[in-house]
């Protein structure tokens, strides 16, 4: 197997700028341009749909309400559990694929449950973008399961001093959408900023045998879209620090992924 070399910073910056979209929230999502970026680069950034001030408000509420005592085991929950407000800490491998390992805290916060951190308005904005990319109705799977799919609105927290996710492909997402003619992409919202909230690590993709840092030029409130069929992951967050599971320090992002509804 050939060695994966990092893409030089200057090339990362060029790639980022070529696939950065400054958007107006009142205007349609530029779906063809985003699709072209995913085909060309595997990732792009959408800026202007969420403000840094909005993100700061969410982060403050998350910090104030967070308790490690709310952590549940990383496996064993039912889908009914995560279709409510639910927090879990997952550490280790994910059978049957031993190479898929992680240290990440996930906080499910569906739009039909209490808005714990003031995220619901931002989730709705994300869902609008997601549905535009899917070619679906603007409110598709917004407040309840629809056509066998539900929106797993959630935060992911990668703790300082060791949070990570190994390189993988999003096979559950692909499986959930493959027979519906939906494009294969993942959308996340940056609720933290590299160089400010964490110094090392963060999101990456592997493209053309190169390790591409996808977050070093992102800002608070940016939405990142990547091809979920690509190999991607989260490089270890601040490995030079002692692991901190007691606070919200580290990397924080949000997702509105569609999963199959198995509760009916």
Language model features with spans:
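Short, P/G- and charge-enriched loop/turn segments at secondary-structure junctions
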Residues: 172-177, 242-243
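Catalytic core of Fe(II)/2-oxoglutarate
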Residues: 183, 194-264
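Short amphipathic
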Residues: 44-50
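Short, conserved beta-strand element in jelly-roll/cupin
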Residues: 155-160, 175-197, 254-258
């Amino acid at each position: 197997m050939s060695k994966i070399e990092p893409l030089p910073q200057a090339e990362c910056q060029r790639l980022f700028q070529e696939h950065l979209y400054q958007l107006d929230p009142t205007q349609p999502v530029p779906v063809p341009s985003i699709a072209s970026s995913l085909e060309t680069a595997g990732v792009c950034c959408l800026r202007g749909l969420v403000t840094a001030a909005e993100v700061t408000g969410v982060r403050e509420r998350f910090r104030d309400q967070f308790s490690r005592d709310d952590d549940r085991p990383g496996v064993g929950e039912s889908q009914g559990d995560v279709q409510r407000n639910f927090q879990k800490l997952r550490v280790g491998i994910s059978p049957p694929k031993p190479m898929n390992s992680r240290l990440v805290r996930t906080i499910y916060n569906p739009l039909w449950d209490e808005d714990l951190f003031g995220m619901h308005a931002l989730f709705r904005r994300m869902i609008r973008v997601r549905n535009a990319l899917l070619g679906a109705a603007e409110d598709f799977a917004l407040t309840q399961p629809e056509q066998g799919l539900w929106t797993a609105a959630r935060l992911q927290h990668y703790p300082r001093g060791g949070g990570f996710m190994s390189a993988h492909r999003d096979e559950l997402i692909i499986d959930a959408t493959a027979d519906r003619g939906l494009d294969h992409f993942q959308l996340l919202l940056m609720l933290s900023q590299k160089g400010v909230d964490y110094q090392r690590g963060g999101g990456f993709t592997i493209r053309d045998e190169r390790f591409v840092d996808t977050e070093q030029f992102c800002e608070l409130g940016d939405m990142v879209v990547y091809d979920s069929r690509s190999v991607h992951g989260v490089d270890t967050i601040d490995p030079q620090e002692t692991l901190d599971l007691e606070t919200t320090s580290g990397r924080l992002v949000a997702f509105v992924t569609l999963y199959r509804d198995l509760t009916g």
